[in-house]
């Protein structure tokens, strides 16, 4: 079984982001980076699939030279190969442009039975790239996967989280899965694999190499961010003390003042 996992490098979520109002970008200079956590669930799921069914796991990302550290982390967890899609044309790509580029890269790398992504990246929470890859490749998809139930030569059955509860879905291979945190607990890299990952050669691909049209990505993407801003701070709550009747009277009065009722 050939498995590919898409990894995204994101700013450290323990740091409050600063925004550049002129560019609508998050200021990343001097900010530590990390792998989007749901993507590590995807790597773990891929490793378990090949441990149970044979094959190998490859990891792929789109970004600059610095994103190789995230690919090396995937290798240190147990992936066999890593690929970097790197081209300045992809800068400022929206979810469609990112999905398009990754799908082109996947086609150029080879055939895969299962393609795994995190359910969403924690920097934008869009959750669109995994489904977009499936659409671009014209293959099955199961989103918000909480458990991989079974795999046959032709199908994969998984449980997925939905607003109505939990669903069990069977899809034909090849299939794209987007992974929930509850799917598994990502393993820690071993020292041996970390050393091997640090020495590994990571092939780079650009638009020309994967057959992607630069006119469709980056600033030419179908959508663009109009405004990026931090939410207004919430007011702290007010604690009302007294007997129940008095509390109810004060609470109603305040709700009327706020025009809530």
Enumerate the language-model features and the residues they cover.
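N-terminal glycine-rich FAD/FM-binding segment characteristic of electron-transfer flavoproteins
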Residues: 1-261
